[in-house]
Each structure stands twice: as C-alpha cells, then as structure tokens.
C-alpha cells in the first residue's frame, strides 16, 4: 500500500512537471513566432520573447532562495477543514509567494520600458495600481498567518480598498485621456459612456483582482492561466502600446517562473499577495489601452470561477429550508473544486483550464486581428 501511494505521488509529480514544461514551450513558441511574424525580432529590446524569457529565468532562480526562506519563516498555508480533503496534505506548504515573483515583474517591466522610453507614464500607473493591490494581498496574507486561520482583513475593508483603487485609477484616466470616454468594441466600434467610465473602472479593478484570487485554489492553476492571459493581452496591445506589451510579457514570464515552483505538487503558493496583484495588472492594462472587450474574453475563465461562487451562494440561500440548510448547485465552489470533488485529478483540472484560457486567448487575438 505504501509503495502504491508513493508510485501515485510520483506519477502526479511527473504529470505536473510535464504540464509545466509544455506550457513553457508553447508560450515561448507563440511569443517567438509572433515576434518574427510582426518584425519585432529586428529590435530585440521591443520584443515579447526577450522580457518573457528574462523574467521567467530570474523568478525561477530567485525561487530556489525564496521558497526555503518562506519555509524557514513558517509562512505556511492554512488549509480550510471544510475544503477538499485531498488538500489537507498541502498543510505546511509556504504561501505568500507573490513577494518574490511580483517585484520581478514590476521592477523588470518598468526598467525595461524606461530603458526604451515607450509608454513610461502608462506603465508607471499600471505598476502603482498593481503594487497597491499586491500590498492589500500581502497584508491579508500576513493577518492570516498571524492568526493561524483563514480570516485575514475584513472583506469590507479589502473590497473598499479595491473599489477605491479602481475609482482613483479611472479618474486619472478620465481626466488625462480624451479618448477614454468611449468604450472601444471590436471592428472599430465605440460605445460612448462618458462619466460612466469611472463606474466601469471601479468595477473592473475589483472584479478582476477577486476573480484571479478565486482561481488560485489548485497547484499551478492561477499562475498558468494568468501566464496565458498576459501573453494574450500582450499580443492584443502590441501594435499600439509597446510599453504595455513589455509589461504584460514580464508578468507572463514571472508567472511561468513562479510556476516552476508552484506546479503540482506545489512547493509554494502565491497567496493573496500574488493573485490580487495579477488581477490588478490585467485590469490596469485593459483600462489604459481601452481593450476591455479583449480583457473580458481573456478573463473568461476567471469570470466563470467568480460566477460559480455567486451562483452557489445565491442558490443555497434561495433554497434554504426550515432547518437552515439549503441546496447546492455544485459539489463545491469555485467550480474547479467541483471537478475535483467529481473525481478529476488536480493536474487534469488544471490542464483543462489551461486549454480553455488558451482557446479564449486565440479568440481574443483573432478578433483583434480582424478588427
């Protein structure tokens, strides 16, 4: 029995590692191919593949120091007792991994853009918004570790900061950009929204950051899907916003570098420090470049994860009987746990979700090309 368990664990470890290498090769190939096709390869500093590979390498190497450090600091993930029973074995795995891969993405992205003098103001704004949400996530992680429970800062406080950050960011864009009051749509169409842009900005920042946060529930899930989404967004904004293309490439690469330590079985989790910041970075680029339609497609999986939680809670409350117990739409939410509870191995769920985001990325890039 012990030998069988070891064999199963070894097989899962190999499957997670193989999935990581497949994703790394695929994203690298796409980045290189599009750089060659577009002619960007003639100017290596303004390609996608160069910052992507650089950030991947830096984060991968940094992880060999950061992960043991987090472990020595006893920054261990608190596992929910009412969560999937298979996750109990993850107890003791260090969390707050966002503290070593997010700074690489932010610093490298900003420095790369500054060195090439492209879209520096816009990238600086994206860095500030991402940093703000990352700090909120870090404080939440710290409170969870300090209390040894899953209760960090209050949900109202966290949501308030997210909404406030989105409002301030939107106000800056609205006051400095004359084109931002029209919501860009595919095929050159535009929807005049005027001051409603502020409400959209506020919602997008909060929704995107929380959606990525909800997706971070399996080894390699949030990191891998975010890497694909950032590369897709980089391809969408590349023709008009080379600086933000580089910013997205650095984030995609940093996610891949983190995934080297986060693939199944994970040696570290990103925590709210990483997931909230990733969502904030995606939202920032979508808002600045007025490509929210593309962001909506690229974030389709994150949206489904969020909707599954909303639907689960709503249905449970609506069907609550005299005994105070309601019915559930899913075996567990977010929806990735539903598949896990249905008997799917983690790696199968994660690989399926990777494929879904890849299809969405192709759709977003294809629609952008047609437009």
Swiss-Prot record:
Query: Cellular location of this protein?
Result: Cell inner membrane
Q: Name one GO molecular function term.
A: metal ion binding
| GO terms under cellular component | plasma membrane
**Cofactor entry:** Mg(2+)
Protein keywords: Cell cycle, Cell division, Cell inner membrane, Cell membrane, Cell shape, Cell wall biogenesis/degradation, Magnesium, Membrane, Metal-binding, Peptidoglycan synthesis, Transferase, Transmembrane, Transmembrane helix
Topology within the bilayer? Multi-pass membrane protein
Q: What class of enzyme is it?
A: transferase
Transmembrane segments annotated in the record for this chain = 19-39, 48-68, 95-115, 119-139, 155-175, 180-200, 227-247, 284-304, 349-369
A Pfam family that this protein carries is Glycos_transf_4
Q: What is its EC number?
A: 2.7.8.13
Pathway involvement?
A: Cell wall biogenesis; peptidoglycan biosynthesis
Q: Which reaction does it catalyse?
A: UDP-N-acetyl-alpha-D-muramoyl-L-alanyl-gamma-D-glutamyl-meso-2,6-diaminopimeloyl-D-alanyl-D-alanine + di-trans,octa-cis-undecaprenyl phosphate = di-trans,octa-cis-undecaprenyl diphospho-N-acetyl-alpha-D-muramoyl-L-alanyl-D-glutamyl-meso-2,6-diaminopimeloyl-D-alanyl-D-alanine + UMP
Principal cellular location given in the protein's record? membrane
- BP term (GO), one: peptidoglycan biosynthetic process
**Database matches in HAMAP family:** MraY
Record PANTHER family: PHOSPHO-N-ACETYLMURAMOYL-PENTAPEPTIDE-TRANSFERASE, PHOSPHO-N-ACETYLMURAMOYL-PENTAPEPTIDE-TRANSFERASE HOMOLOG
Q: What is this protein called?
A: Phospho-N-acetylmuramoyl-pentapeptide-transferase
Query: Which organism is this entry from?
Result: Acaryochloris marina (strain MBIC 11017)
């Amino acid at each position: 029995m012990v030998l069988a368990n070891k064999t199963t664990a070894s097989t899962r470890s190999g499957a997670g590692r193989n999935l990581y290498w497949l994703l790394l090769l695929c994203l690298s190939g796409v980045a290189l191919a599009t750089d060659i096709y577009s002619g960007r390869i003639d100017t290596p500093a303004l390609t996608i593949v160069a910052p992507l590979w650089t950030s991947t390498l830096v984060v991968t190497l940094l992880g060999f120091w950061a992960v043991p450090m987090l472990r020595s600091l006893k920054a261990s993930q608190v596992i929910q007792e009412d969560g999937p029973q298979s996750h109990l074995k993850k107890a003791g795995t260090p969390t707050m991994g966002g503290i070593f891969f997010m700074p690489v993405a932010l610093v490298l992205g900003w420095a790369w853009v500054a060195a090439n003098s492209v879209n520096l103001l816009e990238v600086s704004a994206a860095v500030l918004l991402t940093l703000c949400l990352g700090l909120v996530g870090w404080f939440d992680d710290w409170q969870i570790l300090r209390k040894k429970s899953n209760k960090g800062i209050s949900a109202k406080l966290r949501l308030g900061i997210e909404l406030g950050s989105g409002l301030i960011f939107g106000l800056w864009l609205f006051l400095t950009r004359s084109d931002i009051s029209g919501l860009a749509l595919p095929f050159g169409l535009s929807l005049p929204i005027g001051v409603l842009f502020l409400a959209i900005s506020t919602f997008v920042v909060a929704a995107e950051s929380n959606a990525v946060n909800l997706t971070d529930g399996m080894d390699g899930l949030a990191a891998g899907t975010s890497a694909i989404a950032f590369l897709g967004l980089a391809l969408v904004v590349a023709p008009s916003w080379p600086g933000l293309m580089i910013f997205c490439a650095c984030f995609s690469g940093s996610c891949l570098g983190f995934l080297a330590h986060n693939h199944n079985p994970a040696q570290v989790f990103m925590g709210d420090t990483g997931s909230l910041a990733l969502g904030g970075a995606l939202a920032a680029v979508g808002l600045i470049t007025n490509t929210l339609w593309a962001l909506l497609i690229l974030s389709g999986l994150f949206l489904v994860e969020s909707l599954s939680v909303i639907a689960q809670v709503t249905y449970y409350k609506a069907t609550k009987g005299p005994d105070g117990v309601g019915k559930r739409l899913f075996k567990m939410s977010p929806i990735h746990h539903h598949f896990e509870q249905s008997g799917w191995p983690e790696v199968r769920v994660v690989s399926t979700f990777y494929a879904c985001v890849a299809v969405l990325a192709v759709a977003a890039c294809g629609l952008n090309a047609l437009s």
